[in-house]
A protein has these predicted regions:
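Key DNA-contact positions within bacterial/archaeal DNA-binding proteins
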Residues: 36, 92
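Short, hydrophobic-biased segments on the C-terminal half of alpha helices
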Residues: 42-43
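Alpha-helical residues within the helix-turn-helix
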Residues: 29, 46-47
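A short, conserved structural fragment
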Residues: 47-54
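Mid-protein regulatory/catalytic core that forms ligand/cofactor-binding pockets
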Residues: 102-209
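Basic, amphipathic "hinge/linker" alpha-helix immediately C-terminal to the N-terminal HTH DNA-binding motif
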Residues: 57-76
Length: 216
């Protein structure tokens, strides 16, 4: 499988998490390619039983497609752990590096890397690392955007976005840190959270990319 096709698989998977319907237009926008290029790739992927057309959802990954996506995330996140713990990369540096390496390392390399790292369960951004042969099921899956009540929470996962990671680093907010959800303003569509004795106004776009758990 080519790196380009693997990127399409991940793109379709991620759109399916964010949106109800996966369209050629959305794929083209995220992949930064032309609509005809998307149409051609979609044809190939359908012929290889990686995706199928769905009236309501646009496209769905097949079991084979989901298996391949899970393996890509497994490689990517194990590489991120290695970069942070053994090569002193920072959390906002590792994503782009792992994006390149995930397409080049062998299955044997990944198995030995996982053993070297002590079989980690999550990446530095809090994303779940699926075991070999298992589908990806995120452990930390409650977005801040879905929080309905004020209270004490803990940051458990963030999207692999440079802008988000830079924003969190600027405010010294890291995976595992406690935070207080003080209120939600429906008019401005923002959350007020307290972190490190600082009130932060978090808009809905950011809140969708931060995952938390309630602290009892």
């Amino acid at each position: 499988m080519t790196p380009n096709k693997e990127d399409y698989l991940k793109c379709i998977y991620e759109i399916g998490i964010d949106l109800h319907k996966i369209t050629n237009k959305e794929i083209a926008a995220r992949m930064q390619v032309s609509p005809p290029a998307v149409t051609e790739m979609i044809k190939r992927m359908k012929s290889e039983n990686l995706i199928l057309k769905d009236k309501e959802c646009g496209y769905l990954l097949t079991d084979l497609g989901l298996k391949l996506v899970s393996e890509l995330y497994r490689k990517h996140r194990l590489i991120e752990v290695f970069l942070v713990h053994h090569l002193d990369y920072t959390s906002d540096q590792i994503h782009e590096e792992a994006e390149v390496l995930e397409h080049t390392v062998s299955d044997l390399f990944v198995e030995r890397l996982e053993k070297l790292l002590g079989f980690p369960k999550t990446c530095p951004h809090g994303g779940t690392i699926p075991a070999k042969g298992e589908l990806l099921v995120e452990i930390n899956n409650l977005p801040l955007a879905d929080i309905k009540e004020a209270g004490a929470y803990r940051l458990t996962r963030v999207h692999d976005s440079f802008d988000i990671l830079h924003y969190l680093d600027k405010h010294s907010l890291h995976i595992g840190d406690p935070l207080q959800v003080k209120q939600f303003d429906g008019f401005s569509n923002t959350f007020t959270i307290l972190s490190n004795e600082e009130d932060l106004q978090v808009n809905m776009d950011i809140a969708k990319q931060l995952y938390v758990e309630k602290i009892d």
